[in-house]
Design a protein with these regions (language model features):
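Nucleic-acid substrate recognition interfaces
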Residues: 1-441
Length: 441
């Protein structure tokens, strides 16, 4: 499979006309969107995408053999051909999407009448040799073709040294796409995309190693390396206390500022807090993927944490800031680069039920990370949950590969595996014992 990764290199120069180029490109996309909306009836009759694109270009770009119907070339003279085609493609996509959503609204498939947005946030693509020329091998710079208000000229753009060192160290020799301009936090970046061909693990189920992960709020993640017979080979607690302290400090400053001045002029502080939280999620995801790779895991198993609805209660801010889905998405991308698969299991009762099968646990009121089993044993609640997550994966994979008669026989001997929301680690051990006995017989 193909895995696409990207990285943004910051542009250091402040005296090159990037803003002029960006404004001109967005104005061109706006103009093309208005044009294609007026002639969409004609363009929609063309089924082939390439022919539709060619016809759309002929409408706005004149040559010796083609007289353009609209005066786009006069409004945007000397625009590079590749940049013009990128703008045409963006405008065509916007108009096509609008009419598709409009038909769905008329048929009742979606609610709310869609609108065609002309104020776009399109970003130009700098195609190689036409609008972008890389610098020397060790040079932290590139040449960009930009619009200075009168003409299109080449400008030297200095790039941040640390960003270029990262690209040279980790992505040298990889297939890269044309860089795209990006604006973040009042700064401009060149975002490079790289495509890798990876082969995911094809190890048979019985020979697999899995890394079961319990994502938490107090402890960022707890990982367990587990075999199909239930043997736990290694465990790891992933936590970043300094990052969480920094985030807590920023949230406290926001709270005090809002008490004194209200909710106005607080956007920049919240933006900083969100960036800290995103960085915490990125570090957690990287640690999980690297730990699984170090232990030669074939699959990373998460809980399915698609929480919906309004969150209430005094802990709602913690739950809102918990980037569970972002961690899983980032980790999945990193795992695929290592050739590791990602799977998800039902999250119900993984923390509530003890891994030894003794039933519901009682949380320690002083330390929420600890719990007490009904047998009186004190244990880490997140570690117990990671065992249950791994067990649910193995129970599912073992049962679904069996013939119907053998599956029914095992479910009759181990009734707990029928209900996947209450399966625990102890049920996996019993299932493996019964499965081994049936094979021996």
């Amino acid at each position: 499979m193909q895995v696409v990764s990207s990285y943004g290199a910051e542009i250091k120069n402040k005296n090159i006309p990037i803003r002029h180029t960006l404004a001109l490109y967005r104005e061109a996309v706006r103009c093309l969107t208005e044009i294609y909306e007026t002639v969409w009836t004609e363009l929609s009759m063309i089924d082939q995408i390439k022919r539709r694109f060619n016809e759309a270009e002929h409408l706005v770009h004149g040559t010796k053999k083609n007289h353009a119907r609209f005066d786009f070339d006069a409004r945007f003279p000397k625009m590079p051909s590749y940049l013009r085609r990128a703008a045409i493609q963006h405008a065509l996509g916007s108009v096509s999407s609008y009419h598709t959503r409009l038909e769905q609204w008329k048929n009742g498939a979606i609610s709310g009448k869609p609108k065609l947005v002309y104020e776009n946030h399109a970003m130009p693509v700098f195609y190689r040799n036409v609008m972008y020329k890389p610098g020397e091998e060790s040079e932290d710079a590139a040449c960009l073709k930009l619009y200075d208000g009168h003409d299109w000229k080449w400008f030297r753009a200095g790039l941040l040294h640390t960003d270029m060192e990262y690209l040279r160290r980790h992505w040298s020799g990889k297939k890269s796409s044309a860089p795209v301009l990006e604006k973040r936090h009042q700064k401009y970046f060149l975002r490079f995309s790289y495509t890798e061909e990876v082969t995911l693990s094809k190890t048979p189920v019985k020979d697999q190693l899995i890394c079961s992960v319990d994502l938490g709020i107090n402890t960022d993640a707890v990982c367990s390396i587990m075999r199909s017979d239930g043997t736990v080979l290694d465990r790891k607690f992933i936590n970043f206390p300094s990052e969480k302290d920094r985030l807590s400090h920023v949230l406290g400053r926001i709270r005090r500022f809002q008490k004194e001045h209200g909710s106005k002029q607080i956007g920049s502080r919240w933006a900083y807090a969100k960036r800290l939280n995103t960085e915490l999620a990125r570090k957690t995801a990287r640690s999980i993927a690297e730990y699984a790779h170090e232990n030669h895991a074939d699959v990373i198993v998460f809980e399915y944490l698609e929480m919906k609805g309004k969150i209430s209660g005094k802990k709602r801010q913690k739950l809102h800031l918990w980037k569970k889905r972002e961690i899983q998405t980032m980790c999945e991308h990193k795992a695929h680069r290592y050739g590791i698969r990602v799977s998800r299991v039902c999250a119900w009762n993984t923390s509530r039920l003890a891994y030894d099968g003794s039933g519901p646990v009682s949380r320690d009121p002083k330390n929420h990370n600890l719990c007490v089993f009904q047998s009186g044993k004190q244990y880490n609640c997140d570690l117990s949950a990671s065992y249950n997550i791994g067990a649910r994966y193995w129970i599912r994979e073992i049962i679904k590969t069996l013939p119907e008669t053998e599956r029914s026989s095992l479910e009759a001997k181990v009734p707990a595996v029928k209900r996947r929301t209450s399966c625990v680690y102890a049920d996996l051990l019993i299932l493996q014992n019964e499965y081994g006995c049936s094979k021996a017989a």
